[in-house]
């Protein structure tokens, strides 16, 4: 049935041709997107569907809270460790555990490492090919590519011979007739605007980033034992420090600390001289995308804040990445966020495949219920082979979180906007410099292109914080402060009979919160509200659409059968790239299939 209504400044109209892109994600989770387009190929309705049930909240009930981090860490292998961090924060908050300064520092090093790694992988491996036309790189002149690269930075891998070798590798790859992971790209699509030389440079850096990302995560291996899924502990960090090598075998020693320093230096070098120039190059040739994909970013954004500089202090003055919320586009009034307040964060399920006693009322995570109820309602196809969702009913395995009743965007763009408008000096300088270099107004950052630029900015910011926290750690060690964990309240006998806590941080993709309740030494309730829950949110009882859905509205598609515009905007949020993408007509007939191998 055709419907039309107004919400959040958009006119939702599900008449017209229906396209289905399914799935959109790679690695963690699965996502489906459906849009309606009018006769001018403009998106008039967008529907975001999470197609996988997680259920870890149910698995955790009755378990030892000290083990929760090891379970929830498996929510995601890409932003590895961040769920464990939120979990230990929550359990420590519940029990009243204070961690040593070194533990806080190392946790921040782990998080900053993740930000650098995740943003690099997203920029090149997950979203890069939405902007870089791989096959067009074959037309490039390696000498002109070298001139371009050397004009942008002092990165040593920029000689004509280097780019000739990269181009020759690509040429042999193409001539072999098996493009592998590049086989099903929309190469030649009219939205690809980079010249051949910039495409060759971008492709070369894609390969370099693929290799270098393996180096960054060695920091996790030093302090957490491995990557992905490094080790953590309630009360601190599990890594002993043995500077003079007189203590525990396998503890962190000077050799490993020197390795960490060398990786930090090389990470900052790569981000400053490769990623930042590449992001600006993409921006320079794609300025119209500074007006596409705005979505909720000019209305409602949210950040919890992260990187406490003072151990056990999560107040505004301690958090190096500021937190706050903006609603109704009032960026002059950044509101404080209280994750314990039952009126602030609430989750709704009236359009999700869950049920509450009253589906029209949202529930705070401390009162959360995870009761799966797969009931797709009146859909085209069948319950097990849905050809077209019915967004007027239930249509996603993702709940709809709201902050004071508002759908919110979270992630690098939201964080950058909040930090900028709270006057964070480093953010203001970085953003102004990038937008000035592109000759774009500040409002241009509230866009699909802006999300790409904000990730580059954050990677650079995080690299600086890596060095900052490592220097703090080394100062402590030189002063004889080696403690990395507190075991004072390790035993359940020291805990209250009943207690509850909240742990929050900022994952690369956005605001992350874990809420835990403990009774008689066991987990009685556990709820996670993750970044993708916010951004991929379905509708709520008011009909408000989520961040993904809003960002797609009013986007004009050049070739609907090649939905590059949809992928660019969705990938700008970093929901992970598609393993396979199918575009379907409104009768379920397949128009085009893209399989990324």
From Swiss-Prot:
Ni(2+) binds at residues 76, 79, 576, 579. GO terms for biological process: anaerobic electron transport chain; anaerobic respiration; cellular response to starvation; fermentation; hydrogen metabolic process. It catalyses: H2 + A = AH2. This is one of three E.coli hydrogenases synthesized in response to different physiological conditions. HYD1 is believed to have a role in hydrogen cycling during fermentative growth. It is an enzyme of class 1 (oxidoreductase). Its EC number is 1.12.99.6. Keywords: Cell membrane, Membrane, Metal-binding, Nickel, Oxidoreductase. Binds 1 nickel ion per subunit. It is found in: Cell membrane. It is a peripheral membrane protein. It comes from the Bacteria. This is Hydrogenase-1 large chain. GO terms for molecular function: electron transfer activity; ferredoxin hydrogenase activity; hydrogenase (acceptor) activity; nickel cation binding. Belongs to the [NiFe]/[NiFeSe] hydrogenase large subunit family. Heterodimer of a large and a small subunit. One of its GO terms (cellular component) is membrane. The keyword Cell membrane applies. Its cofactor is Ni(2+). Its main location: membrane.
